[in-house]
Design a protein with these regions (language model features):
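Extended active-site neighborhood of metal-dependent phosphoesterases/phosphodiesterases
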Residues: 37-39, 44, 66, 85-174, ...
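A short C-terminal boundary segment appended to hydrolase-like catalytic domains
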Residues: 39, 253-294
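A mature extracytoplasmic/lumenal domain signature
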Residues: 49-52, 153, 234, 276
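Bacterial N-terminal signal peptides
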Residues: 13-25
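N-terminal active-site segment of His-dependent metallophosphoesterases
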Residues: 27-92, 157, 185
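Active-site glycine-centered loops adjacent to acidic/histidine catalytic or metal-binding residues
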Residues: 50, 81-82, 116-117, 179, ...
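N-terminal secretory signal peptides that target proteins for export/translocation
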Residues: 1-8
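Generic beta-sheet signal
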Residues: 75-77, 172-178
Length: 294
């Protein structure tokens, strides 16, 4: 019997078919397993807090972020303060930021930090942080206006700026993020009541929808307060296991492993997912603008 060898010209075609099938299957699996709809025209971003340790857990969270990006192509990461612990020399910026997030940085994902109490003021001049020399600043993506604040030094000048910037914003969504949480039920730090008294009335007056903070090394979603949805996500590097003290304010919490958040905003909906260092979904839901999480 005479057997002919396969036509080599078919190999590229077969390879394309196999890769396309794998991509479709992977996308289908993501759609089935993820609470995020992954719509083509939505705003997608990640949130990390208290991440800059340079230790193995930080790198493992970063690896989960990279895996997520392959299916959920976010192009923004908001950083909730304590972006770097300990010494903050050039070598530390390499080990505690550039190396763990290299796969994301290399494809153009933009990191936008807020300062925490462990961060040196000089961080505002570090080019990959995109702060442009400002302790607090605002920027817009799609129909969302972000406000990155410096809660460590909340002086009168910043408070006046917050009110002016919120008043002038015209986007549908207003999201504020900063380090010290206005609401937290973690034992170590808890709620920053003085800060809440100072800035929450401004948030309410001008219709802030969502607030992200860190500082407590846990994940917590707070029941909506005065129409605002609050998240604490301070465990992307540091962790305090067993530190949560749940109360009636706590909608969901997780303190058994490091974690980060993935967020998608589409129209009047904000979908969110809290993901552990091992890739486990520890909380998820959707917020309707001017409504409550469900």
């Amino acid at each position: 019997m005479f057997v002919t060898s396969p036509d080599r010209r078919l190999f590229p075609i077969l390879l394309f078919i196999l890769l396309f099938a794998a991509a479709v299957a992977s996308a289908a699996l993501f759609a089935q397993s993820s609470p995020l709809p992954n719509r083509s025209d939505s705003l997608k971003f990640a949130a990390i807090g208290d991440n800059g340790t340079g230790d193995r857990p930080q790198y493992e969270v970063a690896q989960q972020m990279t895996r997520l990006h392959s299916e959920f192509p976010f192009d923004l990461v908001i950083m909730l303060g304590d972006n770097m612990y300990g010494s903050q020399r050039p070598a530390d910026f390499t080990r505690k930021f550039e190396q763990p997030y290299a796969p994301l940085l290399s494809i153009g994902v933009k990191f936008q930090p807020a300062l925490g109490n462990h961060d040196t003021p000089e961080q505002i001049f570090y080019k990959p942080y995109n702060m442009n020399g400002q302790r607090y600043y605002t920027y817009a993506r799609n129909n969302v206006r972000f406000f990155a604040l410096d809660s460590t030094l909340m002086d009168r000048k910043q408070v006046a700026w917050i009110e002016s910037a919120l008043r002038d914003s015209r986007e549908d969504w207003k999201i504020c993020y900063f380090h010290h949480p206005l609401y937290s039920n973690a034992a170590r730090h808890g709620s920053s009541v003085d800060l809440r008294t100072l800035i929450e009335p401004i948030f309410v007056k001008y219709g802030v929808n969502v607030v992200f903070s860190g500082h407590d090394h846990v994940y917590e979603r707070i029941q909506p307060q005065k129409g605002i949805n609050y998240f604490v996500s301070g465990a992307a590097g540091q962790l305090r296991p067993g530190n949560m003290r749940r109360s009636s304010q706590t909608a969901a919490s997780f303190d058994q492993d490091q974690s980060f958040m993935a967020v998608e905003i589409s129209g009047t909906d904000m979908f969110f997912q809290a993901i552990s260092r091992t890739g486990k979904t520890v909380d998820s839901g959707v917020i309707r603008r001017q409504g409550q999480a469900r």
